[in-house]
UniProtKB/Swiss-Prot annotation:
Further remark: The expression of APRR9, APRR7, and APRR5 requires the presence of LWD1 and/or LWD2, indicating the existence of a positive feedback loop within the circadian clock.
Family membership noted in the UniProt record: Belongs to the ARR-like family.
Protein name: Two-component response regulator-like APRR5
Residue spans of biased composition, Polar residues class: 303-319
């Protein structure tokens, strides 16, 4: 015997009975702290004694489960019938901490017992665990919907029974997590909760004695009233509903903003390039100047750049892009190919001198502040060459738009603008763009008053073919504007195709189909067979209606 243990002898004297007096002695071993000051911390932990109501119809199964529960430190009360279990619960609901019941029961099934428990005011706070040999999802789902805390499939395992106390702990903690007294049992707390009007919430310490005389206590907390729980749940649901509504409204606002931004981007990229012929001429000049910058880089128009602060970032291709040579190429001049204002055209004189004066006034007009300064040269190639004579065809063109000019075919300019609309036109994608032609060439080629294509033909033929190859059809549409729309309508009437890109796509597809058909003709399995032996064996094997049959070996006589 160690020095840290001390034996105390206690004599208990009982009152004399009919059979005579009896003296009993018990030796109590008292463990105190030793010299080294070690204290066993297990004696400070609370000891939980959960009382389980076991409802099982089969006698042997009931005895086995009760024995397992007792080994796991539970106090078990076993009943064979659901009706008896319900009567026991109605009589003393505070004496049960956990209910373990079978689904299939006589007199009252497990579903009915579960429904009765969930409808009772006091018993509904007791965790009910259903058990059965059936493991179907429908059965489990039905039990969970009725309010079961868990579902166990037979045969039960010991670790499952050891963890049953967690259901009681979770249930009591979820009801009132603030106060959790460790020195009172679950059933006594429920009884005091039912008689809380007399005690006014004051609890006394109770000691539950076991069969062996040792004192045990269980940790639980008092139940809360159902009404207060419902009020808390309803308040929490209302707050969650308000939060959900606010989040939904914010989501709708963000979605509307995104849709409006996408619509603006679509209008900026495509629809803004289609202009009607009756718009203001000054707006058309500003839009055309911005189109030169919008050739292959997404820059904003000059009018919008003057108004805005320039905070929005612009899109530019990377340095490895094929369009870099066009995007970063500086624009030497930024001229407008639009005709003069309608008021000026009405006052144009028939003489050549007045025409030259008018053209000089147009050329020396002040450019917009953001655009680079133009050269002081004329719209025409040679400085010494006289200006082209004006004709009476200015007001004779029907439906004249911003710059109604004929499209050149193979770099050949039409002499008469009236014959340009009746002749065969080249596709829109073949016409040069401002990014691939110098400003002087572009202004002289597409100016409506130009009647000298011979002087420009050499300069037009010097245009680099490689540069024109990179220009897309969408860029040409944006550069030429409304005149392309008129040409497309005319070409639709004459029966010509709308774009060369579609023709090239159809030609490539036709060539691919032809190549595929030629390869398919070469794949003739009759001409080349990889395994000759397999072919011979297949021909020798007997067939019945095309299917191979097992060959019967004929027995030869000795």
């Amino acid at each position: 015997m160690t020095s840290s243990e001390e034996v105390v002898e206690v004599t208990v004297v009982k009152a004399p009975e009919a059979g005579g007096g009896k003296l009993s002695r018990r030796k109590i071993r008292k463990k105190d702290a030793g010299v080294d000051g070690l204290v066993k911390w297990e004696r400070f932990l609370p000891k939980i004694a959960l009382r389980v109501l076991l409802v099982e119809a089969d006698d042997s199964t009931r005895q086995i489960i009760a024995a397992l529960l007792r080994k796991c430190s539970y106090r078990v009360a076993a009943v064979p019938d659901g009706l008896k279990a319900w009567e026991m619960l109605k009589g003393k609901p505070e004496s049960v901490d956990l209910i373990l019941t079978e689904v299939d029961l006589p007199s009252i099934s497990g579903y009915a017992l579960l429904t009765l428990i969930m409808e009772h005011d006091i018993c509904k706070n007791i965790p009910v665990i259903m058990m059965s040999t059936q493991d179907s999802v429908n059965t489990v789902y039905k039990c969970m919907l009725k309010g079961a805390a868990d579902y166990l499939v037979k045969p039960l395992r010991r670790n499952e029974l050891r963890n049953l106390w967690q259901h009681v702990w979770r249930r009591q903690t979820s009801l009132a997590p603030d106060s959790f007294p460790w020195n009172e049992s679950v059933g006594q707390q429920k009884a005091e909760g039912a008689s809380a009007n007399n005690s006014n919430g004051k609890r006394d310490d109770h000691v539950v004695s076991g069969n062996g005389g040792d004192a045990q206590s269980s940790c639980t907390r008092p139940e809360m009233e159902g009404e207060s729980a419902d009020v808390e749940v309803s308040a929490r649901d209302a707050v969650q509903m308000e939060c959900a509504k606010s989040q939904f409204n914010e989501t709708r606002l963000l979605a509307n903003e995104l849709q409006s931004k996408q619509a603006e981007a679509i209008d900026f990229m495509g629809a803004s390039f289609r202009r009607t012929g009756r718009r203001n001429r000054e707006e058309s000049v500003a839009q055309y100047e911005s189109r030169i910058e919008l050739d292959l880089s997404l820059r904003r128009p000059n009018a919008s750049e003057n108004q805005s602060s320039g905070d929005r970032p612009s899109l530019h291709p990377s340095s490895a892009s094929a369009f870099t040579r066009y995007v970063h190429r500086p624009l030497q001049t930024q001229c407008s190919a639009s005709p003069v204002v309608t008021d000026q055209r009405k006052n144009v004189a028939a003489s050549q001198d007045d025409n030259i004066v008018l053209m000089n006034q147009y050329n020396t007009s002040e450019p917009p502040p953001n655009a680079p300064r133009r050269n002081d040269t004329s719209f025409y190639t040679g400085a010494d060459s006289p200006g082209p004579p004006f004709s009476n065809q200015l007001n004779s063109w029907p439906g004249q738009s911003s710059y109604p000019t004929p499209t050149p075919i193979n770099n050949i300019q039409f002499r008469d603008p009236n014959t340009a609309y009746t002749s065969a036109m080249a596709p829109a994608s073949l016409s040069p763009s401002p990014s691939s032609v110098s400003p002087h060439e572009y202004s002289s080629m597409f100016h409506p008053f130009n009647s000298k294509p011979e002087g420009l033909q050499d300069r037009d033929c010097s245009m680099d073919v490689d540069e024109r190859r990179y220009v897309s059809s969408a860029t040409e549409h944006s550069a030429i504007g409304n005149h392309i729309d008129q040409l497309i309508e005319k070409k639709n009437e004459d029966g010509y195709s709308l774009s060369v890109g579609k023709i090239q796509q159809s030609l490539q597809r036709e060539a691919a189909l032809t190549k595929f058909r030629m390869k398919r003709k070469d794949r003739c399995y009759e001409k080349k067979v990889r395994y000759e032996s397999r072919k011979k064996l297949a021909e020798q094997r007997p067939r019945i209606k095309g299917q191979f049959v097992r060959q019967v070996q004929s027995t030869q006589a000795p």
